[in-house]
């Protein structure tokens, strides 16, 4: 499962990169694109870092970062949609994937926290 999540989190960043190339050449789109590029690509890079964590506490901390970046990505996708910078149909699948990854990461955190608590 770990490898699947690595692939999925990396794919989110790649899909956002493709999406940003479709945005109009407007100042607002440019500013938002910088924000969403950073957080969406950070999902995959921080998940990879979590997989190399030295301890369960380190793993949990890195997963929290993944959760934050995933949530921020979701926020910026909503902004793109609500500001009419991209058609909703174009980001529907991406929003769903980001939400699924967020749910998986939150569930993983809860599992590790229980494991740590029972030690």
Predicted regions and their residues:
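Short, C-terminally biased terminal segments at protein or domain edges
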Residues: 1-119
């Amino acid at each position: 499962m770990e490898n699947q999540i690595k692939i999925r989190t990396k794919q989110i960043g790649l899909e956002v990169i493709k999406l940003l190339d479709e945005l109009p050449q407007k100042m607002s789109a440019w500013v938002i694109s910088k924000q969403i590029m950073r957080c969406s690509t950070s999902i995959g890079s921080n998940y990879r870092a979590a997989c190399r964590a030295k301890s369960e506490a380190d793993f949990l901390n890195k997963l929290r970062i993944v959760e934050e970046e995933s949530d921020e990505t979701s926020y910026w996708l909503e902004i793109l949609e609500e500001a009419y910078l991209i058609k909703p149909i174009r980001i529907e699948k991406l929003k769903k994937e980001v939400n699924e990854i967020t749910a998986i990461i939150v569930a993983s955190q809860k599992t590790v926290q229980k494991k740590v608590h029972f030690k």
